[in-house]
Amino acid sequence: MRVLPAVLCALALCAACSEPPQKEIDRAQGALDAAKAAGADQYAPEAYTAATSALQQAHDAVAQRDYRLALSRAVDANERALEAAREAANGAARARSEAEAALPPAEASLQQLRTKLRAAEAARVPSIQLASARRTAANAQRALQEARKGIGAGRYLAASAALKDLPARIGVEMKAIDQAIAARGTRRRR
């Protein structure tokens, strides 16, 4: 009597693995598609790649008629895709926060640069010495517009990239303007 349940379980397992686990593969593909829609390829690339790899291994196992391995890989791909979607949500929130936090310092730096440009013009610094600072101000304005547009469209990494090192670049130009104003002032005194 004890042998009969064991034989029935073995037969059930063999029957379950005699066909490709299409339902599980489809579920994993759906989870992978949802993870991509959530931005997992950008915000959780390692988890997304692992899920994609596991799903490919499931397809490879089906091609080799190893349905037990295919089932295992499909379930693994589904779990990894769900994890990638969770990580993507966290990554997107973190990227949004970083992009939004980078806006005020960049805007303040641009405003300071514009103020320095006006002061340099009032001090009659030659226009050619201010050309680089004016280009930087125009580029900074474009970068800020791109960043705002990126944040509005949910492209947080692009927004952060647009603002990367912007205050530092503006700082270099402000220092050059200060030097030009100081040089202009010492020439006047002579």
List each language-model region with its residue ranges.
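Sec-dependent bacterial lipoprotein signal peptides
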Residues: M1-A15
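Long, charged/polar, soluble alpha-helical segments
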Residues: C17-R190
